C-alpha cells in the first residue's frame, strides 16, 4: 500500500505524517508533496520531530506531481488548498484539516505533531485491519474538469 500525504508547502504537516508513517508501517510506502513547496522543512518542525527521535534534517520539500498521485493507493490532504492537486478527479481524498505549523510557536508545533502522530497511528491500524478508508471522513470524488 502506498499512502500520499499532501499539504501546501510540504514543509510541515505532510513531512511529519510521512515520517511517522515510515516509522510505524515500514511494510508500506509513504510519499509526501505540496502544491507550493517551500525551500526547506520548517525549523520548528525539524526540532519537534527530533524531540520524538525522528530526524528530518535531510528532507527536502517537493512538489506533488501526477506520478505521485497515480502511484498512491490512499491520498490524505492536510488543509491543502489547491483543487488541482487535492481534489484528484475520480479519487477519494481523506482530509485531515490540520493547522499549518509554519508560523507557530514550538508548543503549538508539538501539539500539531502529536495530533498527526495519533492520526497516523489510527491510519496504520485501519490499514492493518484491511480498512484503509474511514467512513464519513473522505470527500467524494470530484468530477473531471474539462
Descriptions of predicted regions:
Residues 38-40, 69, 100-104:
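A short acidic, often aromatic-flanked loop/helix-cap motif at beta-alpha or helix-coil junctions
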Residues 1-2, 68-78, 111, 139, ...:
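Cytosolic catalytic domains that perform sulfur/thiol-centered chemistry
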Residues 83-146:
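Phosphate-binding/catalytic loops
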Residues 18, 43-46, 71, 90, ...:
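Surface-exposed beta-strand edges and their flanking turn/coil or helix-capping segments
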Residues 1-65:
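Conserved active-site segments centered on acidic
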Residues 28, 32, 56, 71, ...:
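Secondary-structure transition/capping residues
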Residues 59-98:
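Mid-chain, well-packed structural core segment of small domains
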Residues 10, 49, 75-76, 116:
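Conserved small-residue
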Amino acid at each position: 500500500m502506498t499512502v500520499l500525504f499532501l499539504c501546501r508547502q510540504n514543509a510541515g504537516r505532510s513531512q511529519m505524517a510521512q515520517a511517522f508513517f515510515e516509522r510505524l508501517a515500514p511494510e508500506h510506502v509513504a510519499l509526501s508533496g505540496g502544491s507550493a513547496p517551500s525551500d526547506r522543512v520548517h525549523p520548528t518542525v525539524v526540532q519537534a520531530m527530533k524531540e520524538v527521535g525522528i530526524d528530518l534534517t535531510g528532507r527536502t520539500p517537493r512538489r506533488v506531481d501526477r506520478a505521485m498521485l497515480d502511484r498512491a493507493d490512499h491520498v490524505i490532504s492536510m488543509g491543502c488548498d489547491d483543487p488541482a492537486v487535492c481534489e484528484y478527479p475520480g479519487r477519494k481524498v481523506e482530509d485531515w484539516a490540520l493547522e499549518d505549523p509554519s508560523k507557530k510557536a514550538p508548543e503549538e508545533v508539538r501539539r500539531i505533531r502529536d495530533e498527526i502522530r495519533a492520526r497516523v497511528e489510527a491510519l496504520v491500524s485501519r490499514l492493518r485491519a484491511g480498512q484503509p478508508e474511514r467512513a464519513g471522513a473522505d470527500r467524494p470524488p470530484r468530477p473531471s474538469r474539462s
